[in-house]
Every structure is written in C-alpha cells, then in structure tokens.
Amino acid sequence: MDFLTLDLIKTHCRIEGYSEDPDEQRKIDETIKKCANQAEGIVYEHIGKDYPAIIKEYGEIPTRIMQAALMATADMIFERDPKENYAFKMILKPYKKKE
C-alpha cells in the first residue's frame, strides 16, 4: 500500500468518532488501514489499474474511486443487517480539497 496510506486517508477524509483513548484510537487506525488495503485490491480487480497507473493518468487518485473502494470494503469488515442503511460505524467522508 504505497499510495493509499493512512495519512492520505486522513488528509482526504473527514474521520468522525476519533477517540482520546490511545487503545481505542489504535483500533480505529487499524480499521482504517484494513479498509485502505482492501480498497486498493478492489480498485485493481475492477479497473485493472494499480495506484501508480491511476496517479500517472489522473495526477491523483480521484475521490470517487477512493470513495467507492472504501465503501465496498464495509461489508467485508463490518457486520451489518442488510435492512439497515449503508454506513460505516466510523464515518469516512471523502472530499476533494479546494485549491
């Protein structure tokens, strides 16, 4: 995971539910890393491009690609009732920074 790092996710996402408890925060960070690793694999499987190729083509990883990949990991990571609204227990809201 050279390109979609924990730092990149924190830079490009609003992460709600941060904890002052170091142990709880470590668990949150581990979950984010797990999401990022799985998201990178999902992107490659579906569009056949790795992150270096995407960055070469677009100059960055487009927010929609990151958002879709992170959302696709939710069912793999979090247990949820299919009748419930689709949501992370910890909300990741990708956005594009204004320049």
Placement of each model-derived feature along the sequence:
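Divalent metal-cofactor coordination and adjacent catalytic microenvironments
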Residues: 1-99
